[in-house]
């Protein structure tokens, strides 16, 4: 038997269930994309503020570069020769913005989530994770030595019971959640989680703000800023690769946690650092973050418009954010609906198992601030 036969059989099974993934060839045209010769409005991007598609901002940044600062590679890990001064500048700026002791930048959100929990956990650690946390967090949990219990999504009564029954049996308990959940677009009650955490001296709180940074909070710092609990979150994590139109992940935390991660976090230690030119762009965006409030407001308006329409048309839509699922159920039906919307000029993509549970395939509308209300109304007519 050919050693690839099992894999070929599994791929055929995925295709029969309409769950086979393929890489699309995409040409980006600002707010639009061209796929297979058809130009469509992009409703599947994480460019929530529309910054990646905004040419004047890129032009302003590029005009500030000179050959000495345009460094396309760090050529080393940060612990060797890759810790360029721009890293120090970004981490100092993040710490000031969040009013935290320190910050640490990572190569990606995946590196962040897959690396932090294994670094800070041992066999005397219990992780209590929301059932719907991102796959990168699940990978981090699996790589750790900790025991893990996943509580039902946003069910803090169950979480409280787990804390009551387990707090005395472990040296450390880490509650893990996202602030805005990537598939349903709903939110965690961070203040409630802080209240639960504060009842025990051995409980820490880990919050991934990947989908909230840039779009929530008066200064765009996320749901923790919006809910006024930044100071009470031990591991406050975010990414630059979504609303901030750059690359990388970060944590704002105590100096002790930062120093510990530098010494123990394998996905930080054993990787080449980000290129300095990318970090310069990140710093440029962070300096402008406070000026994007009008984009945050516009995103809020169009998100509310589409959410109301989905509910009126009978779709279960738990979202309270700019991520709006239209749950259809069957994978094949979802693919057909996505194809229909694409033929009408909207690049909306199906999300299928294993990304979401069987029977909950959906079209995930990922809105950006440069979409107009008229375009949303045209979309509504088609759904």
Task: Kindly give the residue locations of the regions a language model identified.
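Active-site phosphate-binding strand-loop segment of PLP-dependent enzymes
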Residues: 149, 153-207
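Structural motif of enzymes handling amino- and sulfur-group chemistry
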Residues: 273-292, 298, 302, 311
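Conserved N-terminal alpha-helix of the aminotransferase class I/II PLP-enzyme fold
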Residues: 59, 63-109, 303
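Active-site PLP attachment segment
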Residues: 219, 225-260
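PLP-dependent enzyme catalytic core of the Aspartate aminotransferase-like
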Residues: 53-55, 63, 92, 96, ...
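N-terminal "arm"/small-domain region of PLP-dependent enzymes with the aminotransferase-like
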Residues: 7-9, 13-72, 203
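Conserved PLP-binding catalytic core of the aspartate aminotransferase-like
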Residues: 297-304, 311-345, 367-369
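Conserved PLP-anchoring active-site segment centered on the Schiff-base-forming lysine
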Residues: 116-135, 156
